[in-house]
């Protein structure tokens, strides 16, 4: 069905557009946390003056640390320009070690990011990567941040190159990195290549969730063993029970990841995969658009018999809202040979104002009632459709409904109205219906004229001729009856006259 297919495609595109705007803003907060962690590490190193200090090249001097901290405080107070002034002054110093340059550039990049000056933020991070002695972890973080920023700036090819470099540096990348890779591939319309990174992200995420839950369970078990006193034991028992329950539950993948994978498979026309993904989404994220997408997948796979179940489920959960959605549901009921259900749905929603009061919808309602053998209930819908329409077809249908209900006078009025409007698909059939109604109203001459008009087409010539013969026979029979009745009356009158004459003679 057209609406189902259109809704199917629109839902997939909307889902991808939604996922494209969300992860980057969240992920880039890592830039700030990296800068803070480096500053904290420098402070810790300064406190280890008992011989456990790191190499000089990996230390931050007191003055540099204090200025970075000051810049951080100023930025958090909302003075980005003040923070930049301090950091740029530091950067200009020729006395900075490579490690100190690394920390200054890292925080400088974050300030620019906070100001939404992404090009300058990227330049700062790119300069960081040029430092020969940059720490491995910092190189990983910076490369990934640059990939995110290039994605935001729509430099998708460069972003892909950076992510690939990040994968070379990071042996165990987070699932979100694979999703970022897939998002950039999407922007370049490399849809087939999207599938492996998304599925890798899902597999890794499931593994991480299971491991984290198992660790939480084991930790809770240890805490219970260490617990003392009734309250402490009770609290530890509850915690272990919750941790055990979570460990036994199947982890749930993020909704937007499924949406992205769904779109990738859709572009490959792998509708069986699309169908399976919709079913998973409906288990964890039961939303209207996924029922429609499932219905669309069934349509593409030729599994039309299952289409109604998807739509009916959405209807049962009160997810249908638009007129076209209710009409589609009614059409599916009719295809499934449950026309009465279609009729009651349309009737109710037209009265509620959620289905448009159009000729098309009233016609569908009348068809549903007619197929359900509820001709009388079809009349109001047919009347409404005939009133709206400037074509005679609906008047003819109304006339035929009256004919079926033996309401012949109304039938004549409606069919004549339809013939007057014109634009009837089969005028000969209209004349036959008119002739039948006129015949039952005993308007024989007008009925003959209607059947003569119908007989002008080869299709209706025979049946019209048969009706004319029937009417002429009825007219002749009625004439014979009238003659017989007249003769009988004459005989009765003559008999009465003779009796009257005989009675008078006796007097």
Located regions from the model:
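Solenoid-like repeat scaffolds
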Residues: 53-59, 91-97, 129-135, 164-172, ...
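N-terminal leader/linker segments that initiate helical-solenoid repeat arrays
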Residues: 8, 21, 25-126, 133-141, ...
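Generic helix N-cap/helix-start motif at coil->alpha-helix transitions
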Residues: 60-68, 98-105, 135-145, 170-180, ...
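Alpha-helical adaptor scaffolds
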Residues: 359-373, 380-429
């Amino acid at each position: 069905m057209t609406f189902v297919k259109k809704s199917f495609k629109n839902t997939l595109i909307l889902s991808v557009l939604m996922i494209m705007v969300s992860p980057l803003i969240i992920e880039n907060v890592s830039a700030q946390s990296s800068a803070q962690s480096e500053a904290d590490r420098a402070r810790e190193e300064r406190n280890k003056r008992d011989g456990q200090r790191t190499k000089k090249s990996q230390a931050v001097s007191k003055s540099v640390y204090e200025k970075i901290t000051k810049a951080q405080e100023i930025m958090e107070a909302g003075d980005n320009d003040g923070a930049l002034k301090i950091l740029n002054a530091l950067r200009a110093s020729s006395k900075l070690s490579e490690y100190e340059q690394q920390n200054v550039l890292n925080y400088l990049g974050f300030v620019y990011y906070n100001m939404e000056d992404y090009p300058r933020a990227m330049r700062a991070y790119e300069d960081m990567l040029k430092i020969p002695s940059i720490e491995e972890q910092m190189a990983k973080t910076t490369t990934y941040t640059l990939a995110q920023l290039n994605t935001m700036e729509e430099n998708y090819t460069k972003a892909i190159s950076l992510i690939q470099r990040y994968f070379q540096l990071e042996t165990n990348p987070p699932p979100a990195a694979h999703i970022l890779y897939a998002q950039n591939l999407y922007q370049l319309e490399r849809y087939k290549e999207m599938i492996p990174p998304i599925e890798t992200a899902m597999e890794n995420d499931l593994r991480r969730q299971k491991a984290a839950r198992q660790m939480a369970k084991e930790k809770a078990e240890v805490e219970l063993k260490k617990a003392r006193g009734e309250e402490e034991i009770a609290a530890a028992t509850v915690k272990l029970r919750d941790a055990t329950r979570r460990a036994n539950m199947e982890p749930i993948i993020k909704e937007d990841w499924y949406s992205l994978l769904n779109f990738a498979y859709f572009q490959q026309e792998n509708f069986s995969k699309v169908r399976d993904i919709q079913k998973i989404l409906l288990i964890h994220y039961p939303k209207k658009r996924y029922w429609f997408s499932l219905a669309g997948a069934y349509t593409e796979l030729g599994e039309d018999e299952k289409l109604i179940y998807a739509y009916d489920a959405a209807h049962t959960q009160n997810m249908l809202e638009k007129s076209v959605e209710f009409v589609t549901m009614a059409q599916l009921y009719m295809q499934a040979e449950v026309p009465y259900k279609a009729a009651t749905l349309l009737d109710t929603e037209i009265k509620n104002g959620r289905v448009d009061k159009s000729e098309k919808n009233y016609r569908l309602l009348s068809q549903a009632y007619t197929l359900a053998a509820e001709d009388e209930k079809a009349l109001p819908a047919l009347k409404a459709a005939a009133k709206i329409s400037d074509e005679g077809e609906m008047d003819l249908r109304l006339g035929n409904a009256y004919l079926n209900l033996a309401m012949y006078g109304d039938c004549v009025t409606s069919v004549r109205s339809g013939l007057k409007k014109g634009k009837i698909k089969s005028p000969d059939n209209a004349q036959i219906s008119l002739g039948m109604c006129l015949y039952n109203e005993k308007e024989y001459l007008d009925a003959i004229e209607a059947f003569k008009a119908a007989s002008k087409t080869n299709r209706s010539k025979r049946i019209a001729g048969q009706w004319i013969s029937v009417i002429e026979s009825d007219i002749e029979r009625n004439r014979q009856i009238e003659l017989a009745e007249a003769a009988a009356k004459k005989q009765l009158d003559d008999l009465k006259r003779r009796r009257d004459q005989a009675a008078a003679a006796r007097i």
